Swiss-Prot record:
One BP annotation, GO: D-glucuronate catabolic process
GO molecular function terms attached to this record: ferrous iron binding; manganese ion binding; mannonate dehydratase activity
Species in which this protein is naturally found: Cronobacter sakazakii (strain ATCC BAA-894) (Enterobacter sakazakii)
Stated name of the protein: Mannonate dehydratase
Pathway(s) annotated for this protein in UniProt: Carbohydrate metabolism; pentose and glucuronate interconversion
Family: Belongs to the mannonate dehydratase family.
Keyword Iron: yes
Taxonomic lineage from the root: Bacteria, Pseudomonadati, Pseudomonadota, Gammaproteobacteria, Enterobacterales
Keywords tagged on the record: Iron, Lyase, Manganese
Record-linked PANTHER family: MANNONATE DEHYDRATASE (PTHR30387:SF2)
């Protein structure tokens, strides 16, 4: 497994020198300064590669080339944006970059309600509170039809939650949900967000699948020709929110994606923290079923709370994800590939570390502080090494 680290570019508080000291050799990044929907020029790709090479690092995975909303809704200039996406894939391949992570989540990428949830040990984690989110939908956003998505009891709890909120708390919750978390390409005001939601009024799960199928049938052949592996990231959280459909949340969704364009280049990012939020997602079975299509992994854990729709980010080796079993399944696939002549290790990155130690006194990107991810990387590295020593000595 290749040890990688997500870096948000020159403005990231975590420097390339920091990353190198953490033990990562590969960088997961994107050209965040290129507007969504525009082609990534070869010159800009090479410039970023040179910046990394100066520190002895390589650009291992693109995360992400954003999928424009016109593509997801199949409206406006979707064909132009698909053509731009195709050319960006070609340009990345020309520079030797062969793995692209992306997602097809409508409007929002990943969603949390609390970015500073204090754990018993004093460190801070990200949290999704189902009732807080209901309060946002019902009483702040006031989305039409939102009541149909919540039980009577949930609506009562949301009313009580909202009634106890101060103006500052309302502002913070709103900002956390719609202003854009790290990796998101867009943030919104409430009115902008309502307008964007209205674009999905007539798009259900079937229609969104149709739009994604159109996209895949256009870009996978280009990826095949260029030798690029596409790796779709799951929905986070992996269920419908805000009345929006979600189509990359379960093993059934993965099967649909595989069958829609049956190519090894149409693959997956195995994000254990996203898929693992659902108790009905068997992560090891997912890895084993789609092993040859897993081109990238995000290894983190979450912990479901008393309300199973509420969760927080757990320590990497604890929570609801059996990290040892997942890493074993990944190494089993890596061993199979090695025997078949594919010597490329499967890249993984430690996802969403806790904010801890002196990072508590620093400005950090939510979920992407240095020390929490350093801890996660070291822990997963230890699991990997122990498994290799005992079960996979030929991978050492």
């Amino acid at each position: 497994m290749e040890q990688t680290w997500r870096w948000y570019g020159p403005n990231d508080p975590v420097s390339l020198d920091d990353i190198r000291q953490a033990g990562a050799t590969g960088i997961v990044t994107a050209l965040h300064h290129i507007p969504n929907g525009e082609v990534w020029p070869v010159e800009e790709i090479k410039k970023r590669q040179a910046e990394l090479a100066q520190k002895g690092l390589t650009w291992s995975v693109v995360e992400s080339i954003p999928v424009h909303e016109d593509i997801k809704t199949h409206t406006g200039q979707y064909d132009r944006y698909i053509a731009s996406y195709q050319q960006s894939i070609r340009n990345l391949a020309a520079c030797g970059i062969d793995t692209v992570c992306y997602n097809f989540m409508p409007i929002l990428d990943w969603t949390r309600t609390d970015l500073e949830y204090t754990l018993p040990d004093g460190s801070k984690a990200l949290r999704f509170d189902h009732i807080a989110f209901a309060a946002f939908e019902l009483h702040i956003l006031k989305r039409d039809g939102a009541r149909h998505d919540y039980t009577d009891d949930e609506q009562r709890q949301a009313q009580d939650y909202f009634s106890a909120m101060s103006e500052a708390q309302i502002e913070t919750l709103t900002r956390n949900i719609i202003a854009g978390l790290p990796g998101a390409e867009e943030g919104y005001t409430l009115d902008q967000f309502r307008a964007r939601l209205s674009e999905y009024d007539h798009i259900d799960k079937t229609a969104l699948r149709d739009n994604m199928a159109y996209f895949l049938k256009a870009i996978v052949p280009v990826a095949e020709e260029a030798g690029v592996r596409l790796a779709v990231h799951p929905d986070d959280p992996p269920r419908p929110i805000l009345g929006l459909p979600r189509i990359v949340s379960t093993i059934e969704d993965m099967q649909w994606l595989k069958e829609t364009v049956d190519s090894i280049h149409n693959g997956f990012t195995m994000c254990t923290g996203s898929y693992g939020v659902r108790a009905d997602n068997d992560l090891v079975r997912m890895v084993e079923t789609f092993a040859d299509r897993i081109h990238f992994t995000h290894l983190r854990s979450t912990c479901r709370e008393a309300n199973p729709k509420t969760f927080h980010e757990a320590a990497h080796l604890y929570g609801d994800v059996d990290m040892v079993a997942v890493v074993k399944a990944i190494l089993t696939e890596e061993q199979r590939r090695k025997k078949a002549g594919d010597l490329r290790p499967i890249p993984f990155r430690p996802d969403h570390g806790h904010q801890m130690l002196d990072d508590l006194r620093k400005k950090t990107n939510p979920g992407y502080s240095a020390i929490g991810r350093l801890k996660g990387l070291a822990e997963v590295r230890g699991v990997e090494l122990a498994l290799k020593k005992v079960l996979f000595p030929d991978l050492l």
